[in-house]
Curated annotation (Swiss-Prot):
Subunit structure of this chain's protein: Homodimer.
Entry EC number(s): 1.2.1.70
A GO MF term: NADP binding
Active site per the UniProt annotation: 50
Site keyed Important for activity: positions: 97
Naturally occurring in which organism (per UniProt): Hydrogenovibrio crunogenus (strain DSM 25203 / XCL-2) (Thiomicrospira crunogena)
Protein name, as recorded: Glutamyl-tRNA reductase
Pfam families noted in UniProt: GlutR_dimer, GlutR_N, Shikimate_DH
InterPro entries assigned: 4pyrrol_synth_GluRdtase, 4pyrrol_synth_GluRdtase_dimer, 4pyrrol_synth_GluRdtase_N, GluRdtase_dimer_dom_sf, GluRdtase_N_sf, NAD(P)-bd_dom_sf, Shikm_DH/Glu-tRNA_Rdtase
Domains (record comment): Possesses an unusual extended V-shaped dimeric structure with each monomer consisting of three distinct domains arranged along a curved 'spinal' alpha-helix. The N-terminal catalytic domain specifically recognizes the glutamate moiety of the substrate. The second domain is the NADPH-binding domain, and the third C-terminal domain is responsible for dimerization.
Known role: Catalyzes the NADPH-dependent reduction of glutamyl-tRNA(Glu) to glutamate 1-semialdehyde (GSA).
Keywords annotated in UniProt: NADP, Oxidoreductase, Porphyrin biosynthesis
Family recorded in the similarity comment: Belongs to the glutamyl-tRNA reductase family.
Amino acid sequence: MKLLVLGVNHETAPVDIREKVSFSPAQVQNALSELKSQGLANESVILSTCNRTEIYTTLKSQSPEKIRAWLHEYFELEEDSINSFLYEYADIEAIKHMMRVSSGLNSLVLGEPQILGQIKEAFHLAHKSDSVHQTLHALFQYIFKTAKQVRTDTAIGSSPVSVAFSAVALSKQFFGKLENQTALLLGAGETVELVARHLKESHIGNLIIANRTLSKAHQLTESLGGYAISLHEIDDHLHEADIVIASTASPTPILKTEMVANALKKRRNKPMFMIDIAVPRDIEPAIGNFSDTYLYTVDDLQEIIEENKRSRKDAALEAEEIVELQAENFMAQYQATQQISPIIQRYRQQAYTLKEHALQDALHHLENGGDPQELLTKLANQLTNKILHTPTTNLHHAGLNGQKEVIQAAEQILLTQQSDASDSSENENTHATS
């Protein structure tokens, strides 16, 4: 077996190259089928996101170059045109890479959790397409376990590193829980949408979205809750807001000092927490001079983000140690399995051969008028004696020669509790016929 990872990502290829080898879900199924039907891979999983395309395969005799050639042919690219952007890992280095990817250590945003879900989707799609068998199934379960350990045992995902997430995190630090707070969001672009989603996940009490184009604000509130207003209506609703987060494309400030002064009077000087993540700014800087306003800018958030990035980098060093250990553990288990598998197959074949001989003998006597009950009893006794003959003879010799380790191993292997044996009988039958 040779495990191979072949791919491109945001570090090795620009977007115009990545999009050339990006698989849609329908293409993934077709590509998996091709890899199998053309004899290029025993097993395969394809991961395709905006930042990476990776092919995970197990090979017997095919060389990685044939997978490269197939990739060029599949996307109708000129021969070797993207080779300089491709990376390749084999065996234990492939395992380490897959563990790093699933743990977010190889992501554009260090430690981001979305990649694990994307890998799980890729695995399930390949499994559904009958492209995953024993080796990749075992490996991916180990990879999922490792990714979970990285997130549990390190702080890789605990510190926000996006502006939207940091804005909400800062709001939670200020208020604690957000269930009783009202948030006013200025704008309806991608950043505001992310802020709104994070606020909803944090159980914000009420949500108001103000935007120049009212229909865009309505689209967000329809999916996320709250209500929409136009920018002209802000003055009528500003006093309701405990939290104001602004991110419009306005060339001049939206919130004026006088507007906030009036809102504070209506609030009876109840504090307002404001974050201006727009450039140019949406909130007049002088508003931060009020004793009851707490105004942060995108630069303040950037300091938090940079500090959190440093924290994640420290956690990444711990995560690398986990990856190294778990990759070695999986490889050791796999190699041990590979050593024992031929022995199991030979033992099963011996038992199957004994069964066939005994069965044919019984059928012959049955056709010649033998008593069925006597023949069944004889068949059962023959199979029992023949199957037990070799192990019991060898065990007897081990006793005569004082081989205590062999005796202990035999006791553990042969004297299985009946409940365990019955529980595993279905698996035994499945393996015997596979």
